[in-house]
Design a protein with these regions (language model features):
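Noncatalytic luminal/extracellular "stalk/propeptide" segments of secretory-pathway proteins
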Residues: 23-27, 49, 53-220
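Metal-dependent peptidase/peptidase-like ectodomains
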Residues: 110-112, 123-132, 140-152, 159-165, ...
Length: 549
C-alpha cells in the first residue's frame, strides 16, 4: 500500500511537465485523478481474487469458464457499464474439466506424486493400477522432423505397451538455477528494448520450407518472425500430430501416459493440452505431467531394471459434441463521436494446473478496473470505450479472432466490414502481473509521439519505454492482422516465465498488487487520451490477406 506522502511525490512531477512541441495536449489534472482512484480506492485485487480464488481455473468452454464469465458480466453491470453481454462464438470444441485426480507410486516405495492432468484426457473410470514402461518420445517443434521421429517410435514400440503406463520422457538432470526466478527490468534492459532499430521482418516461407534453429534458445525469436498464417498452420500441425500419437496409444491399449515438463521445477507442474479439443477426435488416454523431481526419480529407478507401479485416478467431465464459447463485452458510451470505439481487452480463459491468476486473471482484472476507474470518475469521453475479455486465447487466439472477424474483417481474405473504419485502436494486457514499463509499437511508428506523450505522466514509475518491436502470443495480434492498431504493453517479468506461466503456481499469491494498481492507472490514462483525441489513431498499411501470404 502506498502512503499519502509517497502519493504526493508521485503526482507532483506531472504538473511540472513542459508542453512538448508537436505532442498532444494532456489533461494532467484528469491523469492525477486517475492515479488517485487507481491507488487509493483500488478494487483490482478484489476482481482478481474472485476470478482466481473463487472461479479459477477457467478453461475455455468449460462450466467453470462460463461461471466466471457470468460473474465478470455481473461485475461490469455493477460498475455501470452498458451493453454488457456474453457474445457467443464457435463451435470451439469439447467442453472439458477435471473433477478429481491423483497419481501415486506404489512400488518400489509409496509416494504421492505431484501431478496435473493434461486437458482433453479421458477418465480412468475409477482408480487403476499398473506397471510403468519407459518409452521416451523425442520432442521437437519441427513438424516434419516430429513426424519422422514418431514413425520410428511407432515401429519400435508397436505391440509392447498394452496394459502399461507409458513414461514419455527419460530421466534428466535438472538445469542449474543460475539466474534469479524473480526479475524486474533494469534501465539498461529497457534501453536495449527501446533501441531496437526496426520491428522484425516476417518470415513468409511455407511451413514445410522453414529452417528451424538448432539452439532451443533461439526458438522465441524464430516464432516471433512467423506471420499469423504460418503460426496457425504450425499450431494445427502440432495438434494433428498429437492426435495421431493419441490414436496410436489408444490402439495399443495403454493405461495412461506420464511425462515431465522441462519448465517444471521445485515441485511445480505445467499443464496444457493432451491433444485435440475437437469432438471429431478421440479424447487422449489419461495423461499426466508429474513434477520433474518425482518423474526423474521414477525414470532412474526404471533404468536400474526395477519395477515401478503406480495407481492413477482421473475423473473428467467432457461434452460429447463441440460447444460454443463466449467473449465478455461491455462499454461506456461515448459523446460526440460515440460511433467510434476505443477497445481494451485481455484473455479471460486459462489453463487448469493453477487458478489462472497471472495468466491471465491479472490482465482481465486490470481491464475491469480500468472501466471502473473511468466510470467512477464520470469522465467525459468522445468515443465509446469497450472492453473485451476473450476466451480461446490459450488454444490459438480463437475468441478475439472470432470477434474481429464478426465485427471488423476477415484476416484470411482481408474483406473488411464497415466497423473496421470506426475502431480507433485496441490495447491489450497479457504478460503476468508485472508493472507496465512501456509499450510495443508493433511496427506502427506513427504512434510513437502519442505514446511518448501519454506515458510521460508515468515517468516516475519508469513506464515510458516505447519500442518499435513487435510482440506476439496474445490477442492484439487478431486486430493487427486486419490492419487495426493493436498494442500490448511491456511488463516486468517478475516470476511469470520462470514459475507461474501455465503452472500449478499460477495463483493469487504470485500477483503483485501495486503493479496491477499502476497498470490500471496507466491504461485508464492512455484510453482516456485515445478516446478524446481529435483524430483516430494512425494505422499501418493494410497487411496482406493470409490467403496471399
Amino acid at each position: 500500500m502506498l502512503t499519502s506522502g509517497f502519493r504526493k511525490q508521485l503526482l507532483l512531477p506531472m504538473f511540472l511537465l513542459p508542453a512538448a512541441w508537436g505532442q498532444p495536449k494532456l489533461d494532467l489534472g484528469l491523469v492525477s485523478r486517475i492515479k488517485t482512484e487507481a491507488f487509493d480506492h483500488s478494487k483490482v485485487m478484489d476482481h482478481l481474487s474472485w476470478l482466481s480464488d473463487v472461479y479459477g481455473p477457467r478453461l475455455t468452454a468449460s462450466p467453470e469458464f462460463f461461471q466466471a464469465a457470468e460473474w465478470a458480466a455481473g461485475r461490469l453491470r455493477e460498475i455501470g457499464l452498458s451493453n454488457v453481454h456474453l457474445e457467443s462464438w464457435g463451435p470451439f470444441g469439447r467442453s472439458w474439466s477435471a473433477e478429481q485426480w491423483s497419481v501415486e507410486m506404489l512400488e518400489p516405495r509409496y509416494a504421492p506424486l505431484n501431478s496435473a492432468p493434461l486437458a482433453w484426457s479421458a477418465s480412468t473410470n475409477g482408480p487403476i493400477t499398473g506397471e510403468t514402461i519407459l518409452a521416451p518420445l523425442k520432442r521437437t517443434f519441427d513438424p516434419k522432423k516430429a513426424r519422422e521421429e514418431f514413425a520410428v517410435y511407432r515401429k519400435e514400440w508397436t505391440g509392447k505397451l498394452r496394459g502399461k503406463f507409458v513414461m514419455l520422457r527419460d530421466a534428466k538432470i535438472p538445469d542449474e538455477q543460475t539466474k534469479a526466478q524473480f526479475h524486474r527490468y533494469t534501465d539498461a534492459e529497457l534501453a536495449e528494448i527501446a533501441a531496437a532499430p526496426e520491428h522484425a521482418a516476417k518470415n513468409y516461407a511455407k511451413l514445410a520450407d522453414l529452417t528451424w534453429p538448432d539452439d532451443p534458445a533461439e526458438l522465441g525469436k524464430f516464432f516471433q518472425r512467423l506471420p499469423e498464417t504460418v503460426f496457425d498452420e504450425l499450431f494445427d500441425a502440432i495438434v494433428q500430430l498429437a492426435t495421431e500419437r493419441n490414436r496410436f496409444f489408444l490402439d495399443e491399449g495403454v493405461l495412461g501416459l506420464l511425462m515431465r515438463d522441462d519448465r517444471s521445477h521445485d515441485g511445480t507442474t505445467n499443464a496444457e493440452a493432451a491433444g485435440s479439443h475437437k469432438s471429431a477426435d478421440p479424447l487422449a488416454p489419461p495423461t499426466f505431467v508429474i513434477t520433474a523431481e518425482q518423474y526423474n526419480r521414477m525414470a532412474r529407478v526404471m533404468e536400474k531394471k526395477t519395477t515401478v507401479r503406480v495407481r492413477v485416478s482421473l475423473k473428467v467431465k467432457a461434452s460429447d459434441a463441440d460447444v460454443n464459447s463466449a467473449n465478455i463485452i461491455g462499454e461506456i458510451p461515448g459523446g460526440k463521436k460515440a460511433d467510434q470505439v476505443v477497445m481494451i481487452g485481455a484473455h479471460f480463459d486459462s489453463w487448469h494446473a493453477g487458478t489462472g491468476a497471472t495468466d491471465n486473471g491479472a490482465g482481465s482484472a486490470v481491464m475491469i478496473e480500468v472501466m471502473r476507474i473511468l466510470k467512477t470518475l464520470n469522465v467525459s469521453m468522445d468515443r465509446t470505450v469497450r472492453i473485451g475479455l476473450w476466451s480461446g486465447e490459450e488454444e490459438g487466439l480463437y475468441g478475439s479472432e472470432a470477434y474481429v472477424k464478426q465485427h471488423f474483417g476477415d484476416a484470411k481474405t482481408l474483406k473488411l466490414l464497415p466497423d473496421h473504419a470506426k475502431l480507433s485502436g485496441y490495447f491489450n494486457l497479457d504478460n503476468g502481473s508485472g508493472k507496465i514499463r512501456g509499450v510495443y509499437l508493433q511496427g506502427n511508428d506513427a504512434m510513437r509521439p502519442l505514446f511518448e506523450a501519454w506515458l510521460e505522466p508515468f515517468r516516475d514509475e519508469n513506464a515510458t519505454t516505447v519500442t518499435i518491436k513487435d510482440t506476439g502470443g496474445t490477442d492484439h495480434l487478431s486486430f493487427d492482422a486486419v490492419g487495426l492498431p493493436g498494442f500490448q504493453f511491456i511488463q516486468d517479468p517478475l516470476d511469470y516465465g520462470t514459475v507461474t506461466h501455465h503452472s500449478s503456481m499460477d495463483t493469487y499469491d504470485h500477483a503483485a498488487p501495486s503493479d496491477l494498481m499502476e497498470a490500471s492507472a496507466v491504461i485508464a490514462a492512455v484510453v482516456y487520451q485515445a478516446a478524446n483525441r481529435a483524430e483516430m489513431l494512425p494505422r499501418k498499411e493494410l497487411p496482406k490477406a493470409r490467403e496471399q501470404q
